[in-house]
From Swiss-Prot:
Chain spans, region Disordered: 28-99
InterPro entries: EF-hand-dom_pair (IPR011992), KIAA1045_Zf_RING (IPR031946), Zinc_finger_PHD-type_CS (IPR019786), Znf_FYVE_PHD (IPR011011), Znf_RING/FYVE/PHD (IPR013083)
Modified residues (Phosphothreonine): 47
Modified-residue entries (Omega-N-methylarginine), positions: 36
Species in which this protein is naturally found: Homo sapiens (Human)
Gene3D superfamilies assigned: Zinc/RING finger domain, C3HC4 (zinc finger)
Modified positions (Phosphoserine) in chain numbering: 43, 51
Protein name, per record: PHD finger protein 24
Lipid-binding residues (covalent, N-myristoyl glycine): 2
Listed Basic and acidic residues bias regions: 28-38, 78-97
A GO biological process held by the record: regulation of G protein-coupled receptor signaling pathway
Family matches, as PROSITE patterns: ZF_PHD_1
Mapped zinc finger ranges (PHD-type): 129-190
Domain of life according to the entry: Eukaryota
Length: 400
């Protein structure tokens, strides 16, 4: 009987030891691994100083892994912002008093999207701004900021709490919103928001294949390299011609009016979004993107430049450049603020081309040809959309 009891005790002891070893291994597996290069003979392991040193080493190891995780999460966050149509989040912003922006849902194309829309020259469309703030949906006697593209209006405080204006930019927005120049709200300022999910997926895939990093500025070398890689997509033997490369360089200069040597990410994204819209959308689909204010702006330009129901092809070409000018010669009957917000520098390529366009841009043959109202709209719709952002950059440079 005694022998049987000793065997059972032995088994129980072995089981207890096995459980203890398993628990110890599990604890080591959960702890962050710390590589020890070897203990010196005079090591302080087991002392208070040794314990403090071990804790410090553990913190350093955890900090190293957290840095790697932060870098990878920052990259994922950049692609997520690009996918969702959001800009760079403000790093130093008091989020305790911030309004939560509504979830953005990308537009979808309807079945009749490619059918001609009914945009008549006459009668004129009435332009009436909303009465309530788009953020808080409250009407107050305070001055509201109207968007020059859509009919939305905003409170100064609401824009601050949403994080769309910060610091000194509030005074600039206030000045622009109540002048002829006008101001574009955060919906209209970002042309990328016009893309559908499928179009955005195509653009993101192109960026990834061409190794474009979101939220980073691009130099002329980066821009030309991207243009070459994008041209070779689907056809490795295809390359940009010398003329196309010069055109890309002129577009880069138009996107960099201040001659800083690089273009900002929002300007590059708007430019690429416009090119994708031009490539994938029919003209009728693009016309449906115009707001009532933009349609009235086009009517004013057509009536001011033509006589009756037609304008010369030369005037139609000049109109493509006029959307990017700070001031626009409106018709007397139009009371809508229609000018583009970005002034063109005197030394910029766009300014020099616009000054000499009457002499060199348009041949004499174009003066004798005429276009009607629908044709005028189709040839100007992309440049009207390109004039939406508040940036001074020209996001789609007209030919010439």
């Amino acid at each position: 009987m005694g022998v049987l009891m000793s065997k059972r005790q032995t088994v129980e002891q072995v089981q207890k030891v096995s459980l203890a070893v398993s628990a110890f291994k599990d604890g080591l597996r959960d702890r962050p691994s710390i590589r020890r290069t070897g203990e010196l003979p005079g090591s302080r392991r087991g002392t208070v100083e040794g314990s403090v040193q071990e804790v410090q080493e553990e913190k350093e190891a955890e900090a190293g892994t957290s840095v790697v995780q932060e870098e990878s999460s920052a990259g994922r966050a950049a692609w997520e912002r690009l996918r969702d149509g959001r800009g760079v989040e403000p790093e130093e912003f008091d989020r305790t008093s911030r309004f939560t922006p509504p979830a953005f849902i990308r537009p979808t194309r309807k079945l009749d999207d490619d059918k001609p829309p009914e945009i008549c020259l006459e009668p004129r469309e009435p332009v009436v701004n909303d009465e309530m703030c788009d953020v808080c949906e409250v009407w107050t006697a305070e001055s509201l900021f109207p968007c020059r593209v859509c009919t939305r209006v905003f409170h100064d405080g609401c824009l601050r709490r949403m994080g769309y204006i910060q610091g000194d930019s509030a005074a600039e927005v206030t000045e622009m919103a109540h002048t002829e120049t006008g101001w574009s709200c955060h919906y209209c300022d970002n042309i990328n928001l016009l893309l559908t999910e499928e179009e955005m997926y195509s653009l993101t895939e192109t960026f990834q294949r061409c190794k474009v990093i979101p939220d980073c500025s691009l130099t002329l070398e980066d821009f030309l390299r991207y243009r070459h890689q994008a041209a070779k997509r689907g056809d490795r033997d295809r390359a940009l011609s010398e003329e196309q490369e010069e055109q890309a360089a002129r577009q880069f200069a138009a996107l960099d009016p201040e001659h800083r040597g690089h273009i900002e990410w929002p300007d590059f994204l708007s430019h690429e979004s416009l090119l994708l819209l031009q490539q994938l959308r029919p003209q009728n689909s693009l016309l449906r993107l115009l707001t009532v204010k933009e349609r009235e702006r086009a009517r004013a330009a057509f009536l001011a430049r033509g006589s009756g129901s037609t304008v010369s092809e030369a005037e139609c070409r000049r109109a493509q450049h006029s959307w990017f000018c700070k001031r626009f010669p409106e018709a007397p009957s139009c009371s809508v603020s229609i000018s583009h917000v970005g002034p063109i520098a005197d030394s910029s390529p766009a300014s020099s081309s616009s000054k000499s366009q009457d002499k060199t841009l348009l041949p004499t043959e174009q003066e004798s040809r005429f276009v009607d109202w629908p044709t005028f709209l189709q040839e100007n719709v992309l440049y009207i959309l390109a004039a939406r952002p508040n940036s001074a950059a020209i996001h789609l440079k007209p030919p010439g």
